[in-house]
Amino acid sequence: MRLIIAGGGTGGHLFPGIAVADEFLARSPENEVLFVGTERGIEARLLPKLGYKLALISASGMKGMGTIKKIMSAGRLLYGYSQSRKILKEFRPDLVLGVGGYASAPIVLAARGMGIRRFIHEQNAFPGLTNKVLGRFVDGVFISMPEAESFFPKEMTQMTGNPIRKEILWGFQERVRSIGDTFSILVFGGSAGAQRVNSALLEALPHLEGVKGKLRITHQTGEKDAARVREGYQAQGFQAQVLSFIDDMSAAYGAADLVVCRAGATTIAEVTACGKGCIFIPFPYAADDHQRKNAESLVHKNAGVMILEEDLTGERLAAKILELMEHPAELAEIEKNARALAQLDAAQAIVSAMVSKN
């Protein structure tokens, strides 16, 4: 069988697609996968390095644009639709899966016009406009959070969870916490980092002076902010490993007692799979404020803590860190609740559902 996985742009869209691709390829040596994305997305840089086939099309969003840019974007979408039909004719897939991102819509709509079975996966609690529209034209919708169910036709919607990269699942080893041990904090803001989160950690350090000797911090900053953050830790005498990018996230999760992070859907899938207590700082400019809704989904189940960026100060962040550090039973309860929300077989469920409907 042949599968096209369309979308990307960010790791939050791409990584679930990679997990599905790996599961599909593992089912049979005769199976083939082709990714379709745009040259500006993370897929153009990452997928060739990982050995996956990738076709590129023209596509961009329209939300928040002026009239001229919307017209230009519509032109790219029409051209992308034409490119998509050509790709479908050449690759001849049995199945198409849209995982979100600009490339998802042209391929899924072209597949509908050519009678190819097509599906979408929604990672977030609150779907974006593209997936809400595409949900009317597909044979199945896979969702990661129950809050998304009401946005799609009930008869074709399946709760699967968000597929997780196999290296996260296979490589994760829980760190055994002991009384009097150091307390390890993992900080990251997505694959590109998050300057506001980085600054908040540095602003929190004076308020953590009393536990300086116990803290061990691993901080993924993004490439642009690494030097500034590293100097900030050194100036205040805190032991921290500052990295522009963490290659082995499974080891980073395993070593962490607490995670400070954004609330993208892939991040939430990974931290729940690893049973980590988190302080979520949702990115306030995410489409339809979906990161806040993602975080709220966990906070309402006592499976995480949230600080909105508008309320974020170094003092407030330090207070939350100290509260969880000094009350291990409270942190353990959050970890237990987070782990209970994990759906480790999401990729298997999606592949099985697509194949069974073919």
From Swiss-Prot:
The keyword Cell division applies. GO terms for molecular function: UDP-N-acetyl-D-glucosamine:N-acetylmuramoyl-L-alanyl-D-glutamyl-meso-2,6-diaminopimelyl-D-alanyl-D-alanine-diphosphoundecaprenol 4-beta-N-acetylglucosaminlytransferase activity; undecaprenyldiphospho-muramoylpentapeptide beta-N-acetylglucosaminyltransferase activity. One of its GO terms (cellular component) is plasma membrane. Its main location: membrane. Pfam families: Glyco_tran_28_C, Glyco_transf_28. The keyword Cell inner membrane applies. It catalyses: di-trans,octa-cis-undecaprenyl diphospho-N-acetyl-alpha-D-muramoyl-L-alanyl-D-glutamyl-meso-2,6-diaminopimeloyl-D-alanyl-D-alanine + UDP-N-acetyl-alpha-D-glucosamine = di-trans,octa-cis-undecaprenyl diphospho-[N-acetyl-alpha-D-glucosaminyl-(1->4)]-N-acetyl-alpha-D-muramoyl-L-alanyl-D-glutamyl-meso-2,6-diaminopimeloyl-D-alanyl-D-alanine + UDP + H(+). Pathway: Cell wall biogenesis; peptidoglycan biosynthesis. It is a peripheral membrane protein. It is found in: Cell inner membrane. Cell wall formation. Catalyzes the transfer of a GlcNAc subunit on undecaprenyl-pyrophosphoryl-MurNAc-pentapeptide (lipid intermediate I) to form undecaprenyl-pyrophosphoryl-MurNAc-(pentapeptide)GlcNAc (lipid intermediate II). PANTHER family: GLYCOSYLTRANSFERASE, UDP-N-ACETYLGLUCOSAMINE--N-ACETYLMURAMYL-(PENTAPEPTIDE) PYROPHOSPHORYL-UNDECAPRENOL N-ACETYLGLUCOSAMINE TRANSFERASE 1. HAMAP family: MurG (MF_00033). This is UDP-N-acetylglucosamine--N-acetylmuramyl-(pentapeptide) pyrophosphoryl-undecaprenol N-acetylglucosamine transferase. It comes from Citrifermentans bemidjiense (strain ATCC BAA-1014 / DSM 16622 / JCM 12645 / Bem).
